[in-house]
Amino acid sequence: MKHKEIAKVISQESIATGVYSMWIQTKDIAAEAVAGQFISVYCKDGAKLLPRPISICEVNKEEGTLRIVYRVVGGGTTERSGYVSGDDIDILGPLGNGFMQREGKKAILIGGGIGIPPMVQLGKELKNIVKVQTVAGYRDELFLTDELEKNGDVYIATEDGSTGTKGTVIDAIKACAVTGDVIYACGPTPMLRAIKEYALANDIECQISLEEKMACGIGACLGCVCKSKEKDHHTNVNNKRICKDGPVFLAQEVEL
């Protein structure tokens, strides 16, 4: 069940160039959130009407807190980067579905860029039931590696080769001989497309979380659809609403 509430910022810090980590005290959202879901964050600036979708990085259900990690890319995130402890933050969530967790299977978690944060909570939820291996892809500057390492083995790929394998997450998987029974992935579309092809070629179940600009965040406006293999019951055409039907899909369900 989704909730709209005025939450409180607990803390915020910069963890890499242009990347911020914020902990939020919520009333109901944290208690119900699972790995793979997101929240919509509303701007204080009245000229910016649409909320910004941000994936959930971590959840502490006992304390009723959640963490978001985001990159500053425009007016909304620039505003948010100025929030300090005690500030109100208007949010809606938890939204979307979560990853379908498979027990008893060796998992490969793959995150690219700002698609890395959801892998922190997913690893926390999976580590007690499966072997967790995380492959994280960066342009150059690393973040969240300490959190990822608490959940299992971590393999790094950087575009410039400054850390780990030089190249893509697929290059790192091959170079480090990472194997598994199921892949969970989040990141830019070209990365997800390559992961889908790799999973298909190696007969591995693959779940992908799609990143897309959103408007309503609840499936009403059809502003964030993607092409799907089957017809959508809502529109009777071959598409899926990323905010409502996703953001997590089985890779074979959607076209990238």
Question: What are the residue ranges of the model-derived segments?
Answer:
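Short, basic/aromatic-enriched C-terminal tail that caps enzymatic domains
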Residues: 1-3, 239-256
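Ferredoxin-reductase
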Residues: 2-85
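N-terminal [4Fe-4S]-dependent radical SAM core
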Residues: 47-49, 200, 253
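FNR/FR-type flavoprotein reductase catalytic core
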Residues: 75-213
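Local cysteine-cluster metal-coordination motifs and their immediate loop/turn environment
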Residues: 118, 212-247
